[in-house]
Amino acid sequence: MTQIAIQPAIRRRHQPWYKILYVQVLIAIVLGVLIGYFYPDFGKELKPLGDGFIALIKMMIAPVIFCTVVHGISSMGDLKRVGRVGLKSLIYFESVSTVALAVGLLVGEVLQPGHGFNIDPATIDPKSVATYVTKAKEEGIVAHLMAIIPDSYVGAIARGDLLQVLLISILSGFAIAFLGKAGEPIADAIDKAAKMFFGIIRIIVRVAPVGAFGAMAFTVGAYGLGSLLNLAALIGTFYLTSILFVLIVLGAIARLAGFSILRFIAYIKDELLIVLGTSSSETVLPQMIQKMEHLGASRSVVGLVIPTGYSFNLDGTNIYMTLATLFLAQATNTHLTIWQELGILGIAMITSKGASGVTGAGFITLAATLSIVPDIPIQSIAILVGIDKFMSECRALTNLIGNGVACVVISISEGELDRDALHETMAHPLEIGEALEPGGGA
Protein backbone atom coordinates (compact mmCIF):
# COMPACT_ATOMS: atom_id res chain seq x y z
CA MET A 1 0.00 0.00 0.00
CA THR A 2 1.13 3.47 -0.72
CA GLN A 3 2.88 5.41 1.98
CA ILE A 4 0.90 8.53 2.81
CA ALA A 5 3.09 11.60 2.48
CA ILE A 6 4.58 13.30 5.49
CA GLN A 7 2.87 16.52 6.43
CA PRO A 8 3.79 19.69 4.52
CA ALA A 9 6.66 21.93 5.49
CA ILE A 10 6.22 23.96 8.65
CA ARG A 11 5.29 27.60 8.31
CA ARG A 12 7.04 29.52 11.02
CA ARG A 13 5.16 32.39 12.59
CA HIS A 14 5.41 34.82 15.43
CA GLN A 15 2.72 35.60 17.98
CA PRO A 16 2.42 37.52 21.27
CA TRP A 17 4.26 35.77 24.11
CA TYR A 18 1.08 35.35 26.16
CA LYS A 19 -0.48 33.23 23.39
CA ILE A 20 2.41 30.75 23.26
CA LEU A 21 1.42 27.42 24.80
CA TYR A 22 4.62 26.71 26.74
CA VAL A 23 4.52 30.21 28.28
CA GLN A 24 0.91 29.68 29.36
CA VAL A 25 1.73 26.26 30.86
CA LEU A 26 4.82 27.61 32.65
CA ILE A 27 2.82 30.46 34.20
CA ALA A 28 0.09 27.98 35.19
CA ILE A 29 2.62 25.71 36.92
CA VAL A 30 4.11 28.62 38.90
CA LEU A 31 0.65 29.85 39.92
CA GLY A 32 -0.33 26.30 40.90
CA VAL A 33 2.73 25.97 43.16
CA LEU A 34 1.98 29.33 44.83
CA ILE A 35 -1.71 28.52 45.38
CA GLY A 36 -0.88 25.06 46.75
CA TYR A 37 1.76 26.45 49.09
CA PHE A 38 -0.09 29.49 50.49
CA TYR A 39 -3.65 28.10 50.30
CA PRO A 40 -3.23 24.30 50.58
CA ASP A 41 -6.91 23.56 51.29
CA PHE A 42 -8.00 25.54 48.24
CA GLY A 43 -5.21 23.91 46.23
CA LYS A 44 -6.52 20.45 47.08
CA GLU A 45 -9.97 21.46 45.85
CA LEU A 46 -8.49 22.21 42.42
CA LYS A 47 -7.70 18.54 41.83
CA PRO A 48 -10.65 18.08 39.40
CA LEU A 49 -9.03 20.55 36.98
CA GLY A 50 -5.96 18.35 36.59
CA ASP A 51 -7.94 15.11 36.66
CA GLY A 52 -10.38 16.44 34.09
CA PHE A 53 -7.65 17.41 31.63
CA ILE A 54 -5.90 14.03 31.99
CA ALA A 55 -9.25 12.24 31.55
CA LEU A 56 -9.97 14.21 28.36
CA ILE A 57 -6.59 13.23 26.91
CA LYS A 58 -6.87 9.61 28.09
CA MET A 59 -10.23 9.19 26.35
CA MET A 60 -8.41 9.85 23.05
CA ILE A 61 -5.29 7.72 23.67
CA ALA A 62 -6.77 4.33 22.67
CA PRO A 63 -8.31 5.49 19.35
CA VAL A 64 -5.19 7.50 18.45
CA ILE A 65 -2.87 4.54 19.14
CA PHE A 66 -5.19 2.16 17.28
CA CYS A 67 -5.33 4.36 14.18
CA THR A 68 -1.61 5.22 14.08
CA VAL A 69 -0.38 1.65 14.65
CA VAL A 70 -2.88 0.06 12.25
CA HIS A 71 -2.15 2.63 9.54
CA GLY A 72 1.59 2.46 10.21
CA ILE A 73 1.68 -1.32 9.67
CA SER A 74 -0.80 -1.50 6.79
CA SER A 75 0.82 1.38 4.87
CA MET A 76 4.25 -0.27 4.92
CA GLY A 77 3.00 -2.91 2.52
CA ASP A 78 6.11 -5.07 2.94
CA LEU A 79 5.46 -7.17 6.05
CA LYS A 80 9.14 -8.06 6.27
CA ARG A 81 9.79 -4.35 6.75
CA VAL A 82 7.20 -4.24 9.53
CA GLY A 83 8.96 -7.13 11.26
CA ARG A 84 12.34 -5.46 10.79
CA VAL A 85 11.17 -2.16 12.30
CA GLY A 86 9.49 -4.02 15.17
CA LEU A 87 12.61 -6.08 15.90
CA LYS A 88 14.88 -3.02 15.76
CA SER A 89 12.52 -1.19 18.11
CA LEU A 90 12.45 -4.02 20.66
CA ILE A 91 16.26 -4.42 20.56
CA TYR A 92 16.73 -0.67 21.02
CA PHE A 93 14.12 -0.46 23.80
CA GLU A 94 15.59 -3.40 25.71
CA SER A 95 19.18 -2.17 25.32
CA VAL A 96 18.54 1.39 26.47
CA SER A 97 16.13 0.25 29.22
CA THR A 98 18.79 -2.10 30.58
CA VAL A 99 21.31 0.75 30.59
CA ALA A 100 18.79 2.90 32.50
CA LEU A 101 18.24 0.15 35.09
CA ALA A 102 22.00 -0.32 35.46
CA VAL A 103 22.55 3.44 35.82
CA GLY A 104 19.99 3.53 38.65
CA LEU A 105 21.78 0.68 40.43
CA LEU A 106 25.22 2.20 39.92
CA VAL A 107 24.27 5.67 41.16
CA GLY A 108 22.40 4.16 44.13
CA GLU A 109 25.52 2.21 45.13
CA VAL A 110 27.86 5.18 44.71
CA LEU A 111 25.78 7.95 46.35
CA GLN A 112 23.96 5.78 48.95
CA PRO A 113 20.88 8.08 49.25
CA GLY A 114 19.27 5.82 51.89
CA HIS A 115 22.31 5.58 54.15
CA GLY A 116 21.73 6.73 57.74
CA PHE A 117 17.92 6.50 57.81
CA ASN A 118 17.99 3.34 60.00
CA ILE A 119 14.27 2.67 59.58
CA ASP A 120 12.81 -0.39 61.30
CA PRO A 121 10.27 -1.96 58.87
CA ALA A 122 8.18 -3.10 61.87
CA THR A 123 7.44 0.55 62.72
CA ILE A 124 6.05 1.36 59.26
CA ASP A 125 2.27 1.62 58.96
CA PRO A 126 1.41 -0.48 55.88
CA LYS A 127 -2.12 0.95 55.53
CA SER A 128 -1.02 3.81 53.29
CA VAL A 129 0.29 1.37 50.70
CA ALA A 130 -2.13 -1.53 51.20
CA THR A 131 -3.82 -0.94 47.83
CA TYR A 132 -0.50 -0.93 45.96
CA VAL A 133 0.77 -4.04 47.77
CA THR A 134 -2.44 -6.00 47.14
CA LYS A 135 -2.46 -5.01 43.46
CA ALA A 136 1.23 -5.90 43.11
CA LYS A 137 0.83 -9.34 44.70
CA GLU A 138 -2.18 -10.13 42.51
CA GLU A 139 -0.22 -9.25 39.38
CA GLY A 140 2.59 -11.79 39.16
CA ILE A 141 4.70 -12.14 36.02
CA VAL A 142 2.37 -14.74 34.44
CA ALA A 143 -0.75 -12.72 35.33
CA HIS A 144 0.97 -9.60 33.98
CA LEU A 145 1.61 -11.31 30.63
CA MET A 146 -1.88 -12.85 30.44
CA ALA A 147 -3.45 -9.44 31.10
CA ILE A 148 -2.17 -8.32 27.68
CA ILE A 149 -4.92 -10.42 26.05
CA PRO A 150 -8.24 -8.50 26.19
CA ASP A 151 -11.63 -10.07 26.89
CA SER A 152 -12.94 -8.61 23.65
CA TYR A 153 -11.76 -6.51 20.71
CA VAL A 154 -13.90 -3.52 21.62
CA GLY A 155 -13.29 -3.98 25.36
CA ALA A 156 -9.57 -3.23 24.97
CA ILE A 157 -10.31 0.16 23.39
CA ALA A 158 -13.13 0.88 25.85
CA ARG A 159 -10.85 0.24 28.85
CA GLY A 160 -7.92 2.06 27.26
CA ASP A 161 -5.39 -0.57 28.40
CA LEU A 162 -2.27 0.40 26.44
CA LEU A 163 -0.82 -3.10 25.97
CA GLN A 164 -4.18 -4.57 24.98
CA VAL A 165 -4.78 -1.76 22.48
CA LEU A 166 -1.30 -2.35 21.03
CA LEU A 167 -2.01 -6.06 20.62
CA ILE A 168 -5.28 -5.63 18.71
CA SER A 169 -3.76 -2.74 16.69
CA ILE A 170 -0.81 -4.87 15.55
CA LEU A 171 -3.08 -7.80 14.65
CA SER A 172 -5.46 -5.47 12.77
CA GLY A 173 -2.60 -3.82 10.89
CA PHE A 174 -1.27 -7.19 9.72
CA ALA A 175 -4.77 -8.36 8.77
CA ILE A 176 -5.34 -5.27 6.59
CA ALA A 177 -1.89 -5.65 5.02
CA PHE A 178 -2.68 -9.29 4.13
CA LEU A 179 -5.79 -8.10 2.26
CA GLY A 180 -3.64 -6.22 -0.25
CA LYS A 181 -5.61 -3.82 -2.47
CA ALA A 182 -8.87 -4.90 -0.85
CA GLY A 183 -7.58 -3.50 2.45
CA GLU A 184 -6.69 -0.05 1.08
CA PRO A 185 -10.18 1.45 1.65
CA ILE A 186 -10.05 0.28 5.28
CA ALA A 187 -6.59 1.80 5.75
CA ASP A 188 -7.76 5.08 4.17
CA ALA A 189 -10.84 5.19 6.43
CA ILE A 190 -8.66 4.61 9.50
CA ASP A 191 -6.32 7.40 8.35
CA LYS A 192 -9.28 9.79 8.02
CA ALA A 193 -10.49 8.78 11.49
CA ALA A 194 -6.99 9.48 12.86
CA LYS A 195 -7.13 13.01 11.45
CA MET A 196 -10.45 13.56 13.22
CA PHE A 197 -9.01 12.29 16.53
CA PHE A 198 -5.96 14.55 16.18
CA GLY A 199 -8.34 17.45 15.57
CA ILE A 200 -10.11 16.67 18.86
CA ILE A 201 -6.72 16.51 20.60
CA ARG A 202 -5.81 19.98 19.27
CA ILE A 203 -9.00 21.34 20.85
CA ILE A 204 -8.34 19.61 24.20
CA VAL A 205 -4.71 20.77 24.41
CA ARG A 206 -5.88 24.39 24.43
CA VAL A 207 -6.93 23.87 28.06
CA ALA A 208 -3.57 22.33 29.05
CA PRO A 209 -2.63 25.38 31.19
CA VAL A 210 -5.82 24.91 33.24
CA GLY A 211 -5.01 21.22 33.77
CA ALA A 212 -1.40 21.95 34.72
CA PHE A 213 -2.53 24.66 37.17
CA GLY A 214 -5.02 22.37 38.92
CA ALA A 215 -2.67 19.37 39.06
CA MET A 216 0.24 21.37 40.48
CA ALA A 217 -1.93 23.23 43.02
CA PHE A 218 -3.29 19.90 44.29
CA THR A 219 0.14 18.25 44.45
CA VAL A 220 1.72 21.03 46.51
CA GLY A 221 -1.43 21.54 48.60
CA ALA A 222 -1.87 17.84 49.40
CA TYR A 223 1.74 16.81 49.97
CA GLY A 224 3.41 20.11 50.85
CA LEU A 225 6.89 21.22 49.93
CA GLY A 226 8.05 20.06 53.38
CA SER A 227 7.89 16.42 52.29
CA LEU A 228 10.55 17.23 49.72
CA LEU A 229 13.02 18.23 52.43
CA ASN A 230 12.57 14.99 54.38
CA LEU A 231 13.74 12.84 51.50
CA ALA A 232 15.75 15.43 49.59
CA ALA A 233 18.69 13.02 49.18
CA LEU A 234 16.62 10.54 47.18
CA ILE A 235 14.80 13.19 45.15
CA GLY A 236 18.03 15.03 44.36
CA THR A 237 19.80 11.79 43.43
CA PHE A 238 16.95 10.73 41.14
CA TYR A 239 16.72 14.08 39.35
CA LEU A 240 20.51 14.25 38.97
CA THR A 241 20.67 10.69 37.63
CA SER A 242 17.87 11.34 35.13
CA ILE A 243 19.50 14.56 33.90
CA LEU A 244 22.85 12.82 33.45
CA PHE A 245 21.16 9.91 31.67
CA VAL A 246 19.45 12.28 29.23
CA LEU A 247 22.56 14.39 28.59
CA ILE A 248 25.17 11.61 28.51
CA VAL A 249 23.44 8.38 27.40
CA LEU A 250 20.66 9.81 25.22
CA GLY A 251 22.95 12.69 24.24
CA ALA A 252 25.56 10.24 22.93
CA ILE A 253 22.90 8.29 21.01
CA ALA A 254 21.57 11.54 19.51
CA ARG A 255 25.07 12.70 18.54
CA LEU A 256 25.76 9.38 16.79
CA ALA A 257 22.45 9.82 14.96
CA GLY A 258 23.46 13.32 13.86
CA PHE A 259 21.42 15.70 16.02
CA SER A 260 21.74 17.62 19.30
CA ILE A 261 19.85 16.36 22.36
CA LEU A 262 19.54 19.93 23.70
CA ARG A 263 18.01 21.20 20.47
CA PHE A 264 15.68 18.21 20.44
CA ILE A 265 14.55 19.05 23.99
CA ALA A 266 13.95 22.66 22.87
CA TYR A 267 11.80 21.35 20.00
CA ILE A 268 9.49 19.36 22.33
CA LYS A 269 9.44 22.00 25.10
CA ASP A 270 5.64 22.43 24.96
CA GLU A 271 5.08 18.72 25.52
CA LEU A 272 7.67 18.62 28.31
CA LEU A 273 5.96 21.45 30.18
CA ILE A 274 2.53 19.80 29.88
CA VAL A 275 4.06 16.58 31.24
CA LEU A 276 5.70 18.56 34.06
CA GLY A 277 2.33 19.99 35.04
CA THR A 278 0.33 16.75 34.79
CA SER A 279 2.98 14.13 35.75
CA SER A 280 1.82 11.95 32.85
CA SER A 281 3.58 11.49 29.52
CA GLU A 282 0.37 10.02 28.05
CA THR A 283 -1.11 13.52 27.95
CA VAL A 284 1.16 14.40 25.00
CA LEU A 285 1.29 11.10 23.09
CA PRO A 286 -0.76 12.42 20.12
CA GLN A 287 1.31 15.62 19.93
CA MET A 288 4.55 13.61 19.99
CA ILE A 289 3.35 11.55 17.03
CA GLN A 290 2.75 14.73 15.03
CA LYS A 291 6.00 16.36 16.14
CA MET A 292 8.07 13.34 15.11
CA GLU A 293 6.43 13.38 11.67
CA HIS A 294 7.23 17.09 11.25
CA LEU A 295 10.78 16.37 12.36
CA GLY A 296 11.13 14.24 9.22
CA ALA A 297 10.49 10.75 10.59
CA SER A 298 8.48 8.38 8.41
CA ARG A 299 4.82 8.26 9.36
CA SER A 300 4.76 4.46 9.32
CA VAL A 301 7.80 4.23 11.63
CA VAL A 302 6.39 6.88 13.99
CA GLY A 303 3.09 4.98 14.11
CA LEU A 304 4.90 1.90 15.38
CA VAL A 305 7.70 3.27 17.55
CA ILE A 306 6.01 6.01 19.61
CA PRO A 307 2.98 3.98 20.83
CA THR A 308 5.04 0.85 21.60
CA GLY A 309 7.68 2.98 23.32
CA TYR A 310 5.06 4.10 25.84
CA SER A 311 4.97 0.52 27.14
CA PHE A 312 8.45 -0.80 26.41
CA ASN A 313 10.82 2.19 26.49
CA LEU A 314 10.42 3.83 29.90
CA ASP A 315 13.90 5.09 30.77
CA GLY A 316 12.79 7.33 33.64
CA THR A 317 10.70 4.58 35.23
CA ASN A 318 13.61 2.14 34.93
CA ILE A 319 16.05 4.51 36.66
CA TYR A 320 13.49 5.11 39.41
CA MET A 321 12.83 1.42 40.01
CA THR A 322 16.41 0.34 40.66
CA LEU A 323 17.38 3.55 42.47
CA ALA A 324 14.30 3.48 44.73
CA THR A 325 14.79 -0.24 45.43
CA LEU A 326 18.37 0.36 46.57
CA PHE A 327 17.25 3.39 48.60
CA LEU A 328 14.69 1.28 50.49
CA ALA A 329 17.26 -1.45 51.11
CA GLN A 330 19.73 1.10 52.48
CA ALA A 331 17.08 2.93 54.54
CA THR A 332 15.95 -0.33 56.21
CA ASN A 333 19.55 -1.61 56.62
CA THR A 334 18.87 -4.55 54.30
CA HIS A 335 22.16 -5.83 52.92
CA LEU A 336 22.07 -6.91 49.27
CA THR A 337 24.78 -8.95 47.57
CA ILE A 338 25.85 -8.18 44.02
CA TRP A 339 23.87 -11.24 42.85
CA GLN A 340 20.72 -10.01 44.59
CA GLU A 341 21.14 -6.61 42.93
CA LEU A 342 21.55 -8.26 39.53
CA GLY A 343 18.42 -10.29 40.32
CA ILE A 344 16.53 -7.06 41.00
CA LEU A 345 17.74 -5.73 37.65
CA GLY A 346 16.51 -8.87 35.89
CA ILE A 347 13.10 -8.76 37.58
CA ALA A 348 12.74 -5.05 36.85
CA MET A 349 13.41 -5.72 33.15
CA ILE A 350 10.16 -7.72 33.14
CA THR A 351 7.95 -5.76 35.56
CA SER A 352 8.77 -2.40 33.96
CA LYS A 353 7.21 -3.46 30.65
CA GLY A 354 3.70 -2.13 30.37
CA ALA A 355 4.15 0.54 33.07
CA SER A 356 2.55 3.09 30.77
CA GLY A 357 2.86 6.85 31.06
CA VAL A 358 -0.08 7.16 33.44
CA THR A 359 0.72 9.15 36.56
CA GLY A 360 1.57 6.83 39.47
CA ALA A 361 2.27 3.78 37.27
CA GLY A 362 5.94 3.82 38.32
CA PHE A 363 4.99 3.44 41.99
CA ILE A 364 2.73 0.45 41.25
CA THR A 365 5.53 -1.12 39.19
CA LEU A 366 7.97 -0.61 42.08
CA ALA A 367 5.53 -2.39 44.41
CA ALA A 368 5.24 -5.24 41.89
CA THR A 369 9.04 -5.55 41.76
CA LEU A 370 9.41 -5.60 45.56
CA SER A 371 6.65 -8.21 45.86
CA ILE A 372 8.86 -10.61 43.87
CA VAL A 373 12.06 -9.66 45.75
CA PRO A 374 11.74 -11.22 49.25
CA ASP A 375 14.82 -9.52 50.71
CA ILE A 376 13.39 -5.98 50.94
CA PRO A 377 10.23 -5.53 53.10
CA ILE A 378 7.47 -4.47 50.71
CA GLN A 379 5.81 -2.25 53.33
CA SER A 380 8.91 -0.03 53.17
CA ILE A 381 7.48 1.65 50.04
CA ALA A 382 5.30 3.61 52.49
CA ILE A 383 8.40 5.79 52.98
CA LEU A 384 8.02 7.01 49.39
CA VAL A 385 4.27 7.74 49.35
CA GLY A 386 4.64 11.42 50.28
CA ILE A 387 7.24 12.18 47.62
CA ASP A 388 6.31 9.87 44.74
CA LYS A 389 4.14 12.56 43.16
CA PHE A 390 7.16 14.89 43.00
CA MET A 391 9.28 12.16 41.42
CA SER A 392 6.67 11.13 38.85
CA GLU A 393 7.29 14.35 36.89
CA CYS A 394 10.93 13.44 36.37
CA ARG A 395 10.03 9.86 35.40
CA ALA A 396 7.54 11.08 32.81
CA LEU A 397 9.89 13.73 31.37
CA THR A 398 12.73 11.23 30.95
CA ASN A 399 10.36 8.68 29.40
CA LEU A 400 9.14 11.26 26.89
CA ILE A 401 12.61 12.37 25.78
CA GLY A 402 13.75 8.75 25.50
CA ASN A 403 10.83 7.83 23.25
CA GLY A 404 11.42 10.79 20.97
CA VAL A 405 15.11 9.93 20.56
CA ALA A 406 14.23 6.27 19.89
CA CYS A 407 11.83 7.28 17.12
CA VAL A 408 14.46 9.40 15.34
CA VAL A 409 17.17 6.74 15.69
CA ILE A 410 15.00 3.91 14.33
CA SER A 411 13.79 6.12 11.46
CA ILE A 412 17.43 6.82 10.55
CA SER A 413 18.33 3.13 10.71
CA GLU A 414 15.50 2.41 8.26
CA GLY A 415 16.51 5.24 5.92
CA GLU A 416 13.08 6.74 6.65
CA LEU A 417 14.13 10.18 7.91
CA ASP A 418 14.01 13.40 5.91
CA ARG A 419 17.43 14.84 6.77
CA ASP A 420 16.52 18.29 5.41
CA ALA A 421 13.50 18.50 7.72
CA LEU A 422 15.64 17.29 10.65
CA HIS A 423 18.38 19.87 10.00
CA GLU A 424 15.86 22.70 9.57
CA THR A 425 14.14 21.75 12.81
CA MET A 426 17.38 21.41 14.75
CA ALA A 427 18.53 24.81 13.42
CA HIS A 428 15.37 26.55 14.69
CA PRO A 429 13.90 24.27 17.39
CA LEU A 430 12.15 26.99 19.38
CA GLU A 431 10.51 28.71 16.40
CA ILE A 432 9.40 25.47 14.76
CA GLY A 433 8.13 24.05 18.05
CA GLU A 434 6.06 27.21 18.48
CA ALA A 435 4.64 26.84 14.95
CA LEU A 436 3.30 23.42 15.84
CA GLU A 437 1.21 24.55 18.80
CA PRO A 438 -2.54 23.87 18.66
CA GLY A 439 -4.05 26.20 16.13
CA GLY A 440 -0.60 27.00 14.86
CA GLY A 441 -1.38 25.91 11.37
CA ALA A 442 1.55 23.70 10.62
Curated annotation (Swiss-Prot):
Annotated signal sequence range: none
Tree of life domain: Bacteria
GO BP terms, alphabetized: L-aspartate transmembrane transport
InterPro entries, A to Z: C4_dicarb_transport, Na-dicarboxylate_symporter, Na-dicarboxylate_symporter_CS, Na:dicarbo_symporter_sf
Transmembrane segments: 20-40, 53-73, 90-110, 160-180, 209-229, 233-253
Bilayer topology: Multi-pass membrane protein
UniProt entry tagged with the keyword Protease: no
A Pfam short name: SDF
Subcellular location: Cell inner membrane
Alphabetized UniProt keyword annotations: Cell inner membrane, Cell membrane, Membrane, Symport, Transmembrane, Transmembrane helix, Transport
GO cellular component: plasma membrane
Coiled-coil ranges per UniProt: none
Keyword Protease: no
GO molecular function, one term: succinate transmembrane transporter activity
Protein task: Responsible for the transport of dicarboxylates such as succinate, fumarate, and malate from the periplasm across the membrane.
HAMAP family, alphabetized: C4_dicarb_transport
Family that this chain belongs to: Belongs to the dicarboxylate/amino acid:cation symporter (DAACS) (TC 2.A.23) family.
UniProt-listed NCBIfam families: PRK01663.1
Protein name in the entry: C4-dicarboxylate transport protein 4
Organism placement in taxonomy: Bacteria, Pseudomonadati, Pseudomonadota, Alphaproteobacteria, Hyphomicrobiales
Record gene name: dctA4
